[in-house]
Regions:
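Short acidic-hydrophobic surface loop/beta-edge motif
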Residues: 16-29
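Short, surface-exposed, charged amphipathic helix/loop patches that serve as local interaction elements
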Residues: 27-108
């Protein structure tokens, strides 16, 4: 069951920007649906400190720092079945705040 519009509006009022992430299994048999708040400075700082020593743990913590829906127990079970999903979801959260932004350098 997905959150209703009232719950989404409450999260927006509390956290500001709220994002929906969806994905499907390769065969299309299952759809994954998440709601996240935008990662803040504290979550990014924690991520930056952890990523050099344990990238998977850093991604995992970034996801759980920002997760609004579904509940954490459900996502933990999912990540136990598919541990790499924490990296995929965490990468999407990084895009939201610009840590994966591509820049081009040109000598002048």
């Amino acid at each position: 069951m997905r959150p209703n519009e009232e719950q989404l509006e409450a999260w927006k009022a509390q956290y500001g920007d709220v994002y929906e992430l969806t994905g499907e299994t390769e065969d299309g048999s299952q759809t994954y649906y998440f709601i996240f708040r935008k990662p803040g400075r504290a979550a990014l700082s924690r991520f930056a400190k952890q990523v050099m020593s344990d990238a998977l743990k850093a991604m995992h913590n970034l996801v759980f720092d920002c997760l609004l829906f579904p509940d954490q127990d459900e996502v933990r079970k999912l990540f136990e079945e598919k541990p790499g999903m924490a990296i995929s979801v965490g990468s999407e959260l990084q895009k939201i705040v610009g840590t994966n932004q591509d820049f081009f350098v040109k000598r002048l």
